[in-house]
């Protein structure tokens, strides 16, 4: 017979049949991946207050893009997310991807370059928001819904085999591999 019955927040009943009570609570093993993905997207941080990390750093590493002639330059200003079109249950039922539309704001600076001196002066500045595509969102369970199917990301640890020494018999040399 069960010694203790616990109702957790997920609606599941956990029964204990052991003699010793649990000493440590079960850790949330998915929390690391959820926090990492939230830190990558930085959806809850205002665009002008985002640190140069995650998706912000990815865009900053590509921009600014300068024309070969030096007559134009494209700068990254910010990115933003629109709300998702469907919730998780609708995406599972309709075979859709649970995602949010990603829009970035870019600034195009056109220069007027003097042919003789090579001096640049700003001719025109245009700023526009551009739809980049839909970015999959992680659910509260730590999964992604892609075309109506739940997918997970499994972290792997790649260990190097260490140092391996080899000795050729009859020679005075040794070789080593890392």
UniProtKB/Swiss-Prot annotation:
UniProt entry tagged with the keyword Transcription regulation: no
Gene Ontology terms describing biological process: DNA-templated transcription
SUPFAM superfamilies: beta and beta-prime subunits of DNA dependent RNA-polymerase
UniProt keyword Transferase present: yes
Keywords associated with the record: DNA-directed RNA polymerase, Nucleotidyltransferase, Transcription, Transferase
GO cellular component, one term: DNA-directed RNA polymerase complex
Pfam families given in the database record: RNA_pol_Rpb2_1
EC numbers, comma separated: 2.7.7.6
InterPro entries in the record: RNA_pol_bsu_protrusion (IPR007644)
Reactions listed under catalytic activity: RNA(n) + a ribonucleoside 5'-triphosphate = RNA(n+1) + diphosphate
Superkingdom field: Bacteria
Task performed by this protein: DNA-dependent RNA polymerase catalyzes the transcription of DNA into RNA using the four ribonucleoside triphosphates as substrates.
Name used for this protein in its record: DNA-directed RNA polymerase subunit beta
Gene source species: Liberibacter asiaticus (Citrus greening disease)
Gene from which this protein is expressed: rpoB
